[in-house]
Amino acid sequence: MKATFNSWDGKYRQPFGAIQAGTSVKWSVAIDEEVQEVTLWLTKINEDDMAYPMTYNSETKMYETSIRIGTSGLYYYYFNIKQNNQYYFLQRARDQFGEAELTQDSTDVRTFQLTCYDRQVPQEPWYAQGVVYQIFPDRFNNGNPHGEITGRKKNSFLYATPEDTPYYIKDEHGAMARWDFFGGNLKGITEKVPYLKKLGVTAIYLNPIFMASSNHRYDTQDFMKIDPMLGTEQDLQELIQTLHDNKMHLILDGVFNHVGADSKYFLKATQDKNSDYFSWFNFIHYPDKYQSWWGVTTLPEVNKHNKQYVNYITGPKGVLAKWTKMQVDGWRLDVADELPMEFLRAIRDRLQKENCQLVIGEVWEDASHKFVNSEFRPYMAGDNLTGVMNYPMRNLIINLLQAKDEAGEISAMNDLEKLVENYPKAFLENCLNNIGTHDTERIKTVLGGDEELVAMAFGLMFAAPGVPCIYYGDEAGLIGGKDPDNRRCFPWGKESHFLEETVSMLARARKANPALVSGKVGFVKIRLGINALVRYNDREIVVYCYNRTNEDVDLDASEMRTYCLPEMIADLVRDLLDQEVIAKKDFLLKKADMMEKEESK
């Protein structure tokens, strides 16, 4: 018996991908032999399995059923087939782009996922169509006239030159003895806006800028003050004004899960149980034993269910309101998966009231099926986050460029397919793609120092759905291992012009081709080390093809295997790539106008 289902093929499932609550979904299964019955098993998380009999349609020669999905949430499904009084399970095939396979093993059936949301998240054109640049403020640029460092912190360590390699200064117990600084500041960022604009950047995302002891500033001392080493509120206003004058935007980092142990909030809580801040924290043994972030005692965790704290962050005179009123354009939320859903909704609500629509959460996994303490987190419902940092995209890009065989490459492509299928379209297009951040090794280091591979990684990031985000210095060829080595100073005057020009070209291509922003997605497998990512809409097809081998290659349509592409689009892509020469360790972007193709038929 052969049974066929493919969640990417409209013959078998309509509509494709994530759906809005209230949508009717049609499932169809083709079976080449007579069977007794076919059943769709559909499960919503935390609810009982539901069985839906499928009816044979003599016209389509398929077993079919249509079901209205009334409420948002996370659903899983598979099919049960009865033949000769034996049961078969039609499950998701591994790394096969939505295809299904039969099994009689009922112990671990691989299900298909169905994401259901209440409403699509808003898409700000400046963001969805743009290019973001992440800056770790202390390590980017010092804009003071003579490079002097202002607002120096007591007992801190200042490096002699920007070329120095950062390291942590710890005591015999492994605790930080001194925090180290290079002296980058807000004026320095403002000074480099022309560089960023030339690169093609349209928005910058800053790691935390509020008052703190450390160089990373995830240990907030005071949410209402700019860190003196970075500058003043006036410096921030000047940066925002300069960005807006250049049609660029600003995203700030909100760290609302924990504060610094030397913050005004925690210090007052430890000094007085009658303090307004005492209830913000969970003391195990007052005052020296308390709940902290992952056991890091310098980062006491805040009780996010505390109404006073929530109001301090999200109230009309709170932290978000204060800074967003200065025309901040969006927020990234640190460790969003540790913030309660009601807190995330309160954050979103406050920002909407301040006319700010962008709330990006730090979530490292596929955010469509994220669980925290066995509780499902409905990030895609439409009422909390509007996107997440796309670390799965980083992982699959690296896997594509390091795969030892074609099976590894197909697996990486399939990982992208899962994101496209699991995420609502607008949510995916709002995700912040990256190939490196302050929490990862530098992409050039990961790829063995090979700048041609780094260029291909940039190309994949720009060609994939989501907003490309460049980690400062990656485009300059900066290297770095794990934290703190990945936080070196920007190498002004020693940049890789090859990578800078690559990024600038990709930014121009993304701006010129709407398919790279909101087009559908498909893949082409040619041979080991040579693959293509396809984006298309009703007007154009854009193909990003890379060759990571050490040979120039004449592309041959007969070698091309396409995935997740309608037959007509697949044929056009083959025509577009056929007989093209792709140089070794290089990539190419090819475009075809759909209207011209239609007229030429």
Go through the PLM ranges and name each one.
Residues 1-128:
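Glycan-association/targeting regions that enable binding to alpha-glucans and other polysaccharides
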Residues 14-16, 524-560:
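Carbohydrate-binding surface patches
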Residues 26-32, 38, 549-563:
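Surface-exposed beta-strand/loop patches in extracellular or lumenal glycoproteins
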Residues 29, 135, 196, 206, ...:
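Conserved, mostly hydrophobic/aromatic
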Residues 31-33, 131, 570-601:
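C-terminal beta-strand-rich structural cap/linker in extracellular carbohydrate-active enzymes
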Residues 136-203, 209-326, 346-353, 369-370, ...:
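Substrate-binding/active-site clefts of carbohydrate-active enzymes
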Residues 138, 372-374, 378-387, 429, ...:
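Aromatic/acidic polysaccharide-binding cleft in carbohydrate-active enzymes
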Residues 240-249, 258, 263-273, 319, ...:
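Active-site-proximal helices and loops of the catalytic beta/alpha 8
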